[in-house]
């Protein structure tokens, strides 16, 4: 498909996109001065590292960021607008608004690809008008050469919608700056074999391939660290990475492990973590920060795991935080993780509900549709808190999190669940509800927030927190009774398991993220029918039935909306959660008995529309058994490391046939833009921390980023320009 033969509106953020402010003043006001200082330095660490996301998104993203910082550090939005509208080839008012919308969306996603869906977005105004705005700026008047250089270095890529640039991915299916542009999936698979042999995990790595004049290939596996060489760089703790930093010959190919990826940015993270340590509340927080500092200094994943262990033990802190290379959704191979850092404040009243859910977990787990042999030997009671986000530095903000993602810690030592309360409440604001009857839309609007609260709780605690991985240990022993445990799908003894060097994410690779989200979503809708669960969240009788109905209706509707995140040209899903919800929709449609119906209709505007209906009387007798049978298969294939069976099952329900492709066209025509979040900013002067808030608008988003990152950033610019030769698309 040529660049001019497709609907460009799918790659534009409309001016009416909702922008919400994440309110946290009340929670922040409840902190002591010491806690505010602790939160402030964690906030700084989280956001300084968030610039790494630019380098992990696209070749041009850091340059666009630097351009915007230069423009808006020099003058206000109002001043720039006044000058731009007076120029000889002035943009219209609407075009200037489109410019601001693009800037806000770029900041909100920390890059020019959507954090939810991984598709590119471009400015909704001509390039010439965008240039007029840039060249009307005070920054241009002060230093034209610098502004022109930045603009010329990123403007073509900013606007390009060549097929492979439209989404993140491998080879011709997209771009990924986790890899040099000459890498494809086979390179990632080859290096994964090397990593397994050396017992190294790839969370904090990038892979760049170099080919010399004689055609000899050298793979450069870059570790994120402030350390730049193999020299031991840690005085206090053993530098377990230094000995790995060298060249290897692997299957006739040179593999070179180097340190120092993102070094200058991680130095700022480390400096602020060290400052935060002075305001920690207990020894677990001190030890946690020490290990994080060691991890970001040396590139050690093991140190980050140790920090995560202390984080788990830090029960019920008032100020909650997590930081590092955490989620691997955006790596097309599903192994390398995006940077994220957050700091938040506990909402005590809401957290009490989640604590009650944790207390009930041991009675709820046996109700899941698999034998007890597929469950962890001991339920490790996790923290489950509702948090108000103070700062979340990454490409997107989730509604709930279950971390850490390290299998051996989750299985043997525990984890934490968090629900981000001010994110959930922001989502509950009025918005247009598509594809439902008027009656359903009214009930949905009323109960979406409380029903989603139940779903998030179950999804995180008993979804991600349930199930066992069957492992054969190096000494030949098993962590399950391999002589008696039976595969529920074959009736035979267990034939497969995880071995040393294998994890869930490496074994299931690119399938792992969506598959696991689907498993957790299934647990949520399966268990939400439980009366005790509903009672914990304050829903009983008919009101509880309505919560169940809206939760299931939301899942079914989300499955239809998921089609927006499917790319038919390469048969790829671009968003793990939305693929998962589409899979669940397909399972429920297959259950039959008119439980779920998708009906093509003419909308009130006369254009094609779809009506989603769910028979609430059949949820328990048709829907729940169907989800239970499917969920059992998901768990068994996960437990037994049976990638082939898991892939066959998941691919079957992920398939989008001609019927659903037609529906996809309607979904795209009626899609509503995803909301953006403006976050507060903290400053400290003479030991006193202040909170600054911003308006919920594009201008407010811009002001918040200028407050966080005033002026130029030579560290980021050098990292960007050093990377560019490896990203030739």
UniProtKB/Swiss-Prot annotation:
Its GO CC terms are:
cytoplasm
Cite the binding residues for Zn(2+): 459, 464, 517
Question: Which Gene Ontology molecular-function terms are recorded?
Answer: aminopeptidase activity; dipeptidyl-peptidase activity; metal ion binding; metalloexopeptidase activity
Coiled-coil zones:
none
Q: Which cofactor does it need?
A: Zn(2+)
Gene Ontology biological process: proteolysis
| Its EC number(s) | 3.4.14.4
- Keyword terms, alphabetized: Aminopeptidase, Cytoplasm, Hydrolase, Metal-binding, Metalloprotease, Protease, Zinc
Give the top-rank taxon of the lineage listed in the UniProt record for this protein.
Eukaryota
Catalytic residues at 460
Q: Where is the signal peptide?
A: none
Q: Which InterPro entries match?
A: Dipeptidyl-peptase3, Peptidase_M49
Entry note: cofactor: Binds 1 zinc ion per subunit.
| Enzyme type, top EC level | hydrolase
What Gene3D superfamilies does the annotation carry?
3.30.540.30
Annotated compartments: Cytoplasm
Q: Which Pfam families match?
A: Peptidase_M49
Q: Which reaction does it catalyse?
A: Release of an N-terminal dipeptide from a peptide comprising four or more residues, with broad specificity. Also acts on dipeptidyl 2-naphthylamides
Q: Which family does it belong to?
A: Belongs to the peptidase M49 family.
**What is the name of the protein in this document?**
Dipeptidyl peptidase 3
Q: What organism does this protein naturally occur in?
A: Nematostella vectensis (Starlet sea anemone)
| The organism's taxonomic lineage, starting at the top | Eukaryota, Metazoa, Cnidaria, Anthozoa, Hexacorallia
């Amino acid at each position: 498909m040529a660049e001019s033969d497709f609907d460009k509106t799918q790659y534009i953020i409309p001016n009416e996109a909702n922008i919400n402010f994440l309110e946290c003043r009340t929670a922040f006001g409840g902190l002591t001065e010491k806690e505010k200082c602790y939160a402030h330095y964690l906030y700084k660490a989280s956001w300084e590292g968030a610039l790494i996301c630019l380098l992990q998104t696209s070749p041009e993203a850091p340059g666009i960021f630097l351009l915007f910082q230069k423009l808006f550090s020099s003058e206000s939005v109002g001043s720039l607008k006044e000058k731009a509208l007076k120029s000889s080839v002035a943009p219209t008012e609407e075009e200037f608004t489109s410019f601001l919308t693009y800037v806000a969306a770029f900041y909100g996603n920390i890059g020019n690809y959507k954090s939810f869906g991984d598709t590119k977005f471009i400015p909704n105004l001509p390039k010439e008008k965008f240039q007029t705005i840039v060249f009307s700026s005070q920054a241009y008047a002060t230093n034209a050469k610098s502004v022109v250089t930045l603009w010329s270095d990123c403007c073509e890529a900013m606007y390009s919608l060549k097929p492979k640039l439209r989404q993140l991915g491998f080879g011709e299916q997209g771009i990924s700056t986790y890899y040099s542009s000459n890498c494809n999936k086979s390179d990632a698979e080859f290096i994964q074999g090397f990593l397994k042999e050396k017992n190294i995990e790839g969370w904090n790595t990038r892979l760049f391939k170099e080919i010399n004049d004689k055609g000899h290939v050298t793979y450069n596996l870059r570790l994120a660290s402030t350390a730049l060489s193999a020299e031991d760089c840690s005085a206090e703790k053993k530098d377990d990475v230094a000995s790995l930093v060298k060249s290897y010959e692997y299957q006739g190919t040179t593999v070179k492990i180097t340190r120092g990826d993102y070094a200058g940015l991680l130095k700022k993270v480390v400096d602020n973590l060290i400052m935060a340590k002075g305001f920690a509340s207990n020894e677990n927080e001190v030890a946690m920060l020490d290990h994080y500092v060691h991890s970001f200094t040396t590139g050690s994943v093991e140190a980050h795991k140790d920090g995560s262990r202390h984080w788990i033990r830090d029960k019920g802190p008032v100020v909650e935080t997590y930081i590092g290379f955490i989620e691997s959704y955006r790596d097309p191979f599903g192994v390398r993780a995006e940077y994220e850092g957050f700091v938040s404040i506990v909402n005590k009243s809401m957290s009490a509900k989640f604590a009650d859910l944790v207390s009930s977990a041991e009675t709820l787990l046996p109700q899941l549709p698999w034998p007890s042999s597929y469950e962890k030997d001991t339920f490790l009671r996790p923290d489950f808190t509702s948090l108000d986000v103070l700062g979340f530095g990454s490409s997107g903000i989730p509604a709930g999190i279950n971390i850490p993602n390290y299998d051996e810690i989750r299985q043997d030592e525990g984890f934490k669940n968090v629900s981000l309360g001010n994110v959930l409440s922001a989502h509950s604001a009025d918005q247009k509800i598509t594809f439902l009857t008027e009656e359903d839309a009214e009930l949905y609007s009323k109960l979406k927030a409380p029903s989603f609260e139940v779903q998030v709780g179950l999804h995180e605690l008993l979804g991600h927190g349930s199930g066992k991985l069957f492992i054969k240990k190096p000494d030949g022993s098993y962590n399950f009774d391999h002589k008696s445990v039976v595969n529920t799908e074959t009736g035979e003894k267990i034939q497969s398991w995880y071995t040393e060097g294998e994890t869930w994410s490496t074994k299931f690779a690119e399938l792992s993220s969506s598959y696991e989200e689907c498993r957790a979503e299934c647990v949520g809708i399966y268990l939400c029918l439980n009366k005790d669960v509903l009672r914990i969240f304050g829903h009983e009788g008919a009101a509880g039935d309505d919560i169940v109905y809206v939760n299931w209706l939301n899942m079914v509707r989300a499955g239809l909306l998921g089609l927006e995140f499917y790319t038919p040209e390469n048969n790829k899903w671009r968003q793990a959660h939305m693929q998962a919800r589409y899979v669940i929709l397909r399972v429920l449609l297959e259950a039959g008995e008119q439980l779920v119906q998708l009906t093509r209709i003419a909308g009130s505007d006369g254009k094609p529309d779809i009506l989603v209906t769910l028979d609430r009387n059949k949820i328990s007798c048709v829907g729940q058994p169907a989800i239970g049978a499917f969920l059992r298969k998901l768990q068994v294939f996960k437990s037994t490391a049976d990638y082939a069976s898991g892939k066959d099952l998941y691919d079957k329900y992920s398939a989008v046939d001609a019927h659903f492709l037609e529906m996809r066209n309607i979904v795209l025509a009626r899609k509503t833009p995803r909301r953006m979040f403006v976050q507060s900013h903290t400053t400290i002067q003479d030991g006193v921390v202040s909170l600054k808030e911003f308006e919920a608008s594009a201008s407010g988003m811009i002001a918040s980023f200028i407050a966080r990152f005033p002026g130029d950033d030579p560290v980021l610019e050098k990292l960007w320009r050093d990377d560019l030769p490896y990203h030739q698309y």
